[in-house]
């Protein structure tokens, strides 16, 4: 059920006959874990929050750096050296106070995967390295969670949704992880901020 304040806040959604208050209530009842609060996670977090997804987890172990600011649009100079999950949650709460934001200031790992995934309906992987992508995929398959995946490389981007029940997974698409020495990172090759 939506409060009068939420009905006002989401009025443009609710006005759509195909969506209405029922659609908004479904978003409010939903939950998403976003792994990575970087160049992919930041815009995803903004839109999930603005749309009114009821509960959003933010998993990242990193701090805001000046080099992040040209593409990680949640952050500003005043947040440099702060944990990304804290800075993101603060900004997102200001964007939409009707959403519950849950910071997880830790690296996604085999030891915490079940605990992190268990309470969320969907997982969005915005991580920036192959070991984490494979781990998130495998955990989603193991614990029965749909996975939204995105990645960027210089001027290119990829996005996909993997459903553990009746479709291929990230590991099906890319069976073998590339050698870490063969894969440059954003600091080495650059990345455009508008993807």
Where are these regions (language model features)?
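Adenine nucleotide-associated cytosolic modules
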Residues: 1-195
């Amino acid at each position: 059920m939506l409060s009068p304040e939420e009905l006002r806040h989401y009025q443009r959604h609710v006005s759509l006959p195909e969506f209405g208050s029922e659609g908004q209530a479904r978003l409010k009842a939903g939950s998403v874990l976003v792994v990575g609060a970087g160049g992919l996670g930041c815009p995803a977090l903004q839109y999930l929050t603005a749309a009114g997804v009821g509960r959003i987890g933010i998993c990242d172990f990193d701090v805001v750096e000046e080099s992040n600011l040209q593409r990680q649009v949640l952050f500003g100079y005043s947040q440099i050296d702060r944990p990304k999950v804290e800075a993101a949650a603060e900004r997102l709460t200001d964007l939409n106070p009707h959403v519950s934001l849950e910071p997880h200031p830790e690296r996604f790992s085999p030891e915490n995967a079940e605990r992190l995934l268990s309470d969320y309906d969907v997982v969005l992987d915005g991580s920036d390295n192959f070991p984490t992508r494979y781990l998130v995929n495998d955990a989603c398959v193991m614990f029965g969670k749909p996975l939204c995946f995105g990645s960027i490389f210089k001027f290119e981007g990829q996005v996909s949704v993997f459903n553990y029940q009746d479709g291929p997974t990230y590991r099906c698409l890319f069976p073998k992880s590339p050698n870490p020495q063969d894969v440059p990172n954003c600091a080495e090759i650059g990345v455009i901020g508008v993807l």
